[in-house]
């Protein structure tokens, strides 16, 4: 299945919305062109080659330069769904990858693992790079065992998810040496044709362990810098005056923008996965952080269309900007789209947001206040576990029957209304935990209270799967059981590679019976999927009513 033999212009199946559930071959459903897709294949090929040399240094007991780790992390993040669509950026990264590889070659000398990844030299022109990219394609090696390919891609997509969390933590000055070393180990393993299916399954579980470690580090970074999230009411309607909408996941960018907008009269709204920022004391202390705008990422084109303010994209998910707002949207970090203004970082780590602030002022914003409407956020592990005695007592008294974690990535597929229906059908004596942008399917509904607690607890961003794990293990300890013994069901929606990292994290802990949807990943071969079903009782969602009955082991 060489994509060139089949007349494919590209091949990508890393996200949930991949064409026909099999793979994008002409244009990415995400908006990725064949040119970008092929440059990304070559970038991944290059960092695998870098890792072949890096592994030699690791085996000699040496640590890899953190600048190289940062580069690998940024490349992985750049190739994640809905992050960067700018070919110029990709060519710059490719040229840098060759410089790093050549530098490592001079340090290591000739290495034992002389794979094509290690020995390949990047040509000078983009045209030639694109010609070479076919050799880096996922389907290039027609003789490769489909289970080996499936596991390699699963590991790679897990690494992409880890890189997003690692990047966020590193922006705050936090990183894990263990995860940094693992990037090299895992990428090098993807070049090793001697590894068996069993060995790659072990590496897949290690990827899940690395995902937990990086989420733990990001939780540590966010809470050390901004405090523990605490319950907080957030206005989801607009206030009078000029404004900037901040999307993505990066708390540091939001803080810098809030600092620079102080006293300017510009209001700041979160969007998408930035909603949980309102729970952090270090961010909600700014009075001009006035609320949250809109819904999940897939609605952005419609919702940004007639905005009378500016938009800042700090991480994914970026969709093709419509002409109506292309002049009002800015990117930063690894995010990019050709023709969209990019705000870079100075050597001291600061960013200059003066242009976006000035444009927001000129646009004028909203002419009048809308009637306020509030939702509740801020239920991280620290907040929830401080009430654990109360929760345990309520469960033992029969006041709380069951917990449902309904969360993950949202997306455009019609079948995702399952998650809305599910949340609405959850019995009144059950608690719903939610996280990531999947929450927008139901987080504006009123679920009321049970046993003196809100029935809907917003745990945070996609990386706050770590918070959910802490809550689950904390409650399990209180009940003297393990997570699988809790009255807890996990109903997970996935879209991009952070969700892959999250799923692998849960599986690496031995958590069973997870419901995954709206469809299964195209990159899972039948045998790999069967292994996950047999080992972890992984289930595809069916319909909300039947799945709730199964979770509760009885009628609603």
Descriptions of predicted regions:
Residues 2-19, 32-36, 48, 66, ...:
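Anaerobic metallocofactor- and corrinoid-dependent redox/one-carbon enzyme cores
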Residues 2-228, 233-241, 245, 265, ...:
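Long, compositionally biased, glycine/small-hydrophobic-enriched stretches that function as flexible linkers
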């Amino acid at each position: 299945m060489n994509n060139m033999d089949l007349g494919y212009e590209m091949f990508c199946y890393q996200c949930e919305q991949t064409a026909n559930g099999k793979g994008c071959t002409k244009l990415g459903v995400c908006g990725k062109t064949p040119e970008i897709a092929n440059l990304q294949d070559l970038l991944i090929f290059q960092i695998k080659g870098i890792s072949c040399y890096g592994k030699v240094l690791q085996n000699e007991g040496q640590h890899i330069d953190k600048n190289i780790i940062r580069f690998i992390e940024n490349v992985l993040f750049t190739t994640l769904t809905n992050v960067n669509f700018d070919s110029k950026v990709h060519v710059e990264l490719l040229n840098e990858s060759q410089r790093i590889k050549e530098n490592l070659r001079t340090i290591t000398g000739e290495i034992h693992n002389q794979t094509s990844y290690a020995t390949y030299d990047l040509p000078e022109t983009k045209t030639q790079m694109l010609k070479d990219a076919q050799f880096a394609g996922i389907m290039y090696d027609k003789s490769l065992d489909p289970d080996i390919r499936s596991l390699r891609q699963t590991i790679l997509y897990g690494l992409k998810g880890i890189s997003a969390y690692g990047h966020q933590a590193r922006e705050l000055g936090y990183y894990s040496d263990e995860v940094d070393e693992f990037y090299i180990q895992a990428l090098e393993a993807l070049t090793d044709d001697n590894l068996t299916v069993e060995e790659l399954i072990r590496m897949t579980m290690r990827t899940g362990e690395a995902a937990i470690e990086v989420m733990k580090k990001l939780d540590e970074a966010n809470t050390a810098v901004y405090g523990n999230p605490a319950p907080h009411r957030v206005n989801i309607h607009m206030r009078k005056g000029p404004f900037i909408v901040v999307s993505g996941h990066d708390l540091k960018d939001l803080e810098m923008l809030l600092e620079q907008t102080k006293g300017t009269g510009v209001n700041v709204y979160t969007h998408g996965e930035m909603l949980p920022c309102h729970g952090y004391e270090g961010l909600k202390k700014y009075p001009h952080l006035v609320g949250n705008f809109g819904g999940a990422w897939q609605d952005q084109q419609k919702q940004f269309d007639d905005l009378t303010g500016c938009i800042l994209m700090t991480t994914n998910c970026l969709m093709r900007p419509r002409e109506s707002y292309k002049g009002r949207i800015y990117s930063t970090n690894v995010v990019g789209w050709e023709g969209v203004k990019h705000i870079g970082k100075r050597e001291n780590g600061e960013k200059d947001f003066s242009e976006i602030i000035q444009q927001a002022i000129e646009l004028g914003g909203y002419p009048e206040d809308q009637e306020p409407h509030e939702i509740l956020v801020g239920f991280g592990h620290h907040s929830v576990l401080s009430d654990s005695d109360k929760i345990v007592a309520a469960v033992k008294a029969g006041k709380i029957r069951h917990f449902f974690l309904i969360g993950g990535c949202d997306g455009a597929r019609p079948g995702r209304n399952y998650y809305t229906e599910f949340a609405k059908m959850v019995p009144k004596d059950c608690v719903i935990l939610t996280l990531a942008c999947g929450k927008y399917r139901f987080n504006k509904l009123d679920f009321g209270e049970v046993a003196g607690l809100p029935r809907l607890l917003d745990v945070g961003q996609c990386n706050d799967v770590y918070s959910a794990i802490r809550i689950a293990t904390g409650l399990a300890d209180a009940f003297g059981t393990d997570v699988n013994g809790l009255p807890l069901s996990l109903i997970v929606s996935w879209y991009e590679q952070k969700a892959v990292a999250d799923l692998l994290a849960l599986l690496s802990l031995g958590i069973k019976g997870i419901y995954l949807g709206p469809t299964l990943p195209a990159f899972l071969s039948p045998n790999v999927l069967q292994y996950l079903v047999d080992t972890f009782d992984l289930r595809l969602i069916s319909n909300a009513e039947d799945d709730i009955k199964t979770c509760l082991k009885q009628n609603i």
